[in-house]
Amino acid sequence: MEKKWIKIRGANEHNLKHVDLDIPRDSLVVLTGLSGSGKSSLAFDTIYAEGQRRYMESLSSYARQFLGQMEKPDVELIEGLSPAISIDQKSTNRNPRSTVGTVTEIYDYLRLLYARVGIPHCPECGREIKKQTVDEMVDLLMKREEGTKMQLFAPVVRGKKGKHEKLLESIRRSGFVRARIDGNMYELEEEIDLEKNNRHTIEVLVDRLVVRKGIEKRLTDSIEQVLSLSNGLLLVDFLNGEELRLSTSFSCPVDGSSIEEIEPRSFSFNNPFGACPTCFGIGYKMEFDAELMIPDESLSLNQGAISVMGWMNSKDEGSFTHAMLVALSEKYGFSLDTPFCELPEKIRKIILQGTGTESITVRYASQFGKGNVHRVVFEGLLNNVERRYKECFSEKMKQEYEQFMRITPCPSCHGARLKPGSLSVTVGEKSIYESCTLPLDQFHDWISTVTLTAMEEKIADQIIREIKARSKFMLDVGLNYLSLARSAGTLSGGEAQRIRLATQIGSGLVGVAYILDEPSIGLHQRDNDKLIATLKRLRDLGNSVIVVEHDEDTMREADLIVDIGPGAGEHGGQVVAVGTAKEIMKNKDSITGQYLSGKKKIPLPKQRRTFTKTLDVYGAQENNLKNVDVKIPLSVFTCVTGVSGSGKSSLVNEIVHKHCAKVLNKAKMIPGKFRKMEGLEALDKVIDIDQSPIGRTPRSNPATYTGVFDLIRDLFASSKDAKERGYTKGRFSFNVKGGRCEACSGDGIVKIEMHFLPDVYVPCEVCNGKRYNRETLEVRYKGKNIYDVLNMTVEEAYEFFAHIPSIQRKMQTLMDVGLSYIRLGQPSTELSGGEAQRIKLATELSRRGTGRTLYILDEPTTGLHFEDVRKLVEMLQRLADGGNTVLVIEHNLDVIKCADYLIDMGPEGGSGGGTVLCTGTPEEVAENPISYTGKYLKRYLN
């Protein structure tokens, strides 16, 4: 039978150079190559884009207007292509309502399970509550031993204050003779005088019966009479001290608390029928925090301790806020020059929360010298800022205030997102929120062993089977430490991608082309086998799985490897080698093959640095950290390792980075929970080199971020042409009026709105996409205008500015981190996370350092080929050579083996992690029998 292929001919998207390639269908194919070589251009911008476009074209024009139309990629022909699904890292849902449970759809099945077989309990007292029909009540009472005496009461008042005169009169007129009030029997004919301010319980005696055959009709009539009197509640007194309370609705027969009819929507925090009415299902509230408003309590009020807009000028004697603080100090007898931390607790409370109903006398002279005396109630800093926030309509001003807010759990639901009634329903003795907070491995065990009655099992069988299958897929991709309640916005790119991968396997689609972008990111070597097995399973279902990947194990297990290169940018865009791992290893032109065969390798450092000073963290308890004490060496290169979810990010990002940024950089951050930190005096600043974009708009680019554009504009402004025309540096900015093209406001492109098609961006007709007006472009330096320079690659700019050391140094560092191929004016929106991170790294390397900086990097090898990793390690070593402290969270063993010191966390993820397993040099950790990292590291050190 003829093998089916996806045939690509003449692919020219981005830097691809007329690529012709045949990819076998229903296979696991890895696309690899240097960063910027064209892998993503081939996988996402060509194969996926064309597969998606063809599917879209099959839809009606009406449907297309809602879905959007994808542009046809620059390719001559693609044959044998299936509908394509892209699972990348950029499409993580940041909606606060989105959780792991909702993304995987497990929560939808859980809602159905709880609605169908959940046992409701009273939200107040916790008693199990059941609703029963009149017939069920009769049958229950008739099962009592013959001769059993009983009294039927209607509880008409339960624990309410008042004299209840009208109610008692109404009951008497209805023909009832006796009632039990607060436990005592009364004849309704007698005068009953109840204490108005006490709580009372009134139960009307409806009937007295003895259990025997033939009383069913009378019992039924009496029960119906009771239920009509008491809104569905029946109290049976058996005259021996035993009482039975029954209800026709989900209401507690003891205290009367009721819950609504149980439906799947009762457990949805995105539906008003289930959502907590206080936080509307978000689970938290944003509240102003005094710690963020007064970040440095060692300052006095006169020194500007308050950093809130409108209060920052409180040290200015002409401001009204200063006049109020003076009035406060006079009334309560404290000095505005005393450090805030030394003020008495009572005074600090008044400053933050106000004087209550007490007035103060404020003497205020306006800028025109007119003096006024006011009697005002001081509302307090927190109340003042909250009021101004609520009254303000400007989005920019709101964002300004929001930096002083922190997230706190909702006071009503405590983060559970649901109404009390919904949270009182249990399955297997757990509420839906309790089951969702279990780590997925524990959740899977719980749902697999939950005890149900025979009837409940019949109802829930299909639901539980679906939940078990989907949670098992999550375990198969190494996400055992996550919980279903985890907010989707807090997931890393790799975690989000593996969740979507598990969801796709759960969907059971066949005949699809899956395009994945480095699914192994953030995954420990221990869990890599599970991920590879998952990819193979997706393939075995009958799908084509095309993975952009740099992981060695994935390459060795792939059916086919396509090596794109040979270099990056203009030097890439070609297929260097195609074949199995063994075939690639024999190819002399393939850098990937040379690394796989061991001909090329990232060398171990000749000598590991030693240290004398440490940054000491005590009592770290953020997330799953278990009261951790750890010493982080200073002036060396340290890697924090451990399985996914072991607590690395909680320690490094939430505690070390945020506390150091707050103290050293005066940043408005609230660190995670820890007891104390020592050793900060050896550092002067902390810099987090993450993978967030270098800018949010196309106006931001590598030239503006690195600061080289300022130097280039200075150079153009000092040219002969510019001086003759009187042009200054500002003339060469595309962000301000003067030199830019005003037709496109310096964007170079113009947006044209289309109705049934996506918006089209076309080059500006006035400047032809060059961003500047004609006069500005006439100014040249060495024959090139400002647009030509922005269009240069880093490599070209290095040659062009050979005699300008300040510019050349910045270009050199960009080349050192493997970014020789990017253009100086390339919009930040076109850069990958890995490229953005390396631009930040290069910017730091080009600065003249103090040698006292703490650099923090979280998985910097994302998107990097073996050769790029080698360059990255060299850069990190250079930072440490300058006396700086480099702290890296990493799973890549080539980086780990080059570190001076390792902090290995674990042993497992989630609740099974959160401790420091071992510390030491890579050699010491490799010999530790309890370290998973050490086990895999061993072969890299030999």
Question: Each predicted region: which residue ranges?
Answer:
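Conserved phosphate-binding elements of NTP-dependent enzyme cores
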Residues: M1-N942
